[in-house]
């Protein structure tokens, strides 16, 4: 019998109204949502459900919102068998909660701080990210090396799927790549709506502050392996996982390698839990033979639970 990996999306999947269908409709989800609200110092649920103040897109708000939505969905599922977990960037924190490494409230506090540090690291306009479509990793890496100078850098940041590599770095170089992308061989280069050079070595400036912050929380060995973004293999040791979560700030997300590692362990069913189907699409591009289930709404939860009574 094949194995199951539960996967969690990262930033970019947020949308106004997220998790509002679960609230007061699904008891276990409602408990998670209320707990998150009690843990942070701003009106998280108002931001998720209506975004009246337009702040959902700010990374210090986006991160706790996405973590909360994924865990609210996860907690509502009956008889979910898990062999491995994996998350994309921020989604890795949902994996930590799912596998018992972090208490949910601690994870909420950590991703809130992670977002604040990321937002404070560089003024708006200094760094950015872009998705390069139609080139493989080696091609993108060569282009980045050519564009980078002693003063400014651009690096591969998310190795998402064959033909989709996200780069990160100084904004002028991102803009140059967007402008020259086609002549460099890319089908398209799309700037991403992010406020900083995430997953690039520029983010090392917050390494020490973040490491000190997460040390105050209890980290437990994982109940089942978490395939980590930085090394694309399953880890269960709490200290190793914690170290890798710091490295994750300034290291590329090895999503292709992580997915292939899981398939090599016998995983043939991926369950994406959280808003959107971004990871489902990437996994299909990596291997079209695996089964993929998406759980992103109350209806999805009801459908799953009706089939797993």
Where are these regions (language model features)?
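Short glycine-rich catalytic loops that host catalytic nucleophiles or stabilize transition states
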Residues: 191-194, 263, 296
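Alpha-helix C-terminal capping segments
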Residues: 74-80, 214, 301-308
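A short, acidic, amphipathic alpha-helical segment used as a generic capping/interface helix at domain edges
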Residues: 252-267
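FabD-like malonyl-/acyl-CoA
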Residues: 2-139, 269-298
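Conserved functional loop/turn residues at catalytic and ligand-binding sites
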Residues: 89, 218, 266
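Short, flexible loop segments at boundaries between secondary-structure elements
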Residues: 231, 291-309
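Alpha/beta catalytic cores of group-transfer enzymes, especially the acyltransferase/condensing modules
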Residues: 11-13, 39-40, 100-251
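Non-catalytic positions within long, well-ordered alpha-helices that form the structural scaffold/packing
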Residues: 78, 182, 263-266
């Amino acid at each position: 019998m094949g194995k199951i990996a539960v996967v969690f999306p990262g930033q970019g999947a947020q949308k106004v109204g997220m998790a509002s269908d679960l609230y007061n409709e699904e008891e276990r989800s409602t408990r998670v949502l209320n707990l998150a609200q009690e843990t942070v110092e701003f009106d998280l649920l108002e931001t998720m459900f209506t975004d009246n103040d337009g702040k959902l897109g700010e990374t210090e708000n986006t991160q706790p919102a996405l973590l909360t939505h994924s865990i609210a969905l996860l907690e509502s599922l009956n008889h979910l068998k898990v062999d491995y977990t994996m998350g994309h960037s921020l989604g890795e924190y949902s994996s930590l909660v799912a596998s018992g490494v972090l208490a949910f409230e601690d994870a909420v506090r950590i991703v809130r701080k992670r977002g604040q540090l990321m937002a404070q690291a560089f003024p708006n306009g200094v760094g950015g990210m872009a998705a390069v479509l139609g080139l493989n990793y080696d091609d993108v890496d060569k282009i980045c090396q050519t564009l980078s100078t002693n003063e400014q850098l651009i690096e591969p940041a998310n190795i998402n799927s064959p033909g989709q590599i996200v780069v990160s770095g100084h904004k002028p170089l991102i803009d140059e790549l967007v402008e020259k992308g086609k002549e460099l061989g890319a089908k398209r280069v799309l700037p991403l709506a992010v406020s900083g050079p995430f997953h690039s070595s520029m983010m090392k400036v917050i390494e020490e502050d973040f490491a000190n912050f997460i040390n105050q929380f209890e980290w437990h060995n994982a109940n089942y392996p978490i395939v980590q973004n930085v090394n694309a293999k399953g880890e269960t040791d709490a200290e190793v996982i914690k170290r890798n979560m710091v490295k994750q700030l300034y290291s590329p997300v090895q999503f292709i390698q992580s997915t292939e590692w899981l398939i090599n362990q016998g995983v043939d069913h991926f369950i994406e839990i959280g808003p959107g189907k971004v990871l489902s699409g990437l996994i299909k591009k990596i291997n079209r033979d695996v089964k993929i289930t998406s759980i992103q709404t109350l209806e999805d939860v009801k459908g799953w639970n009706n089939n797993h009574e």
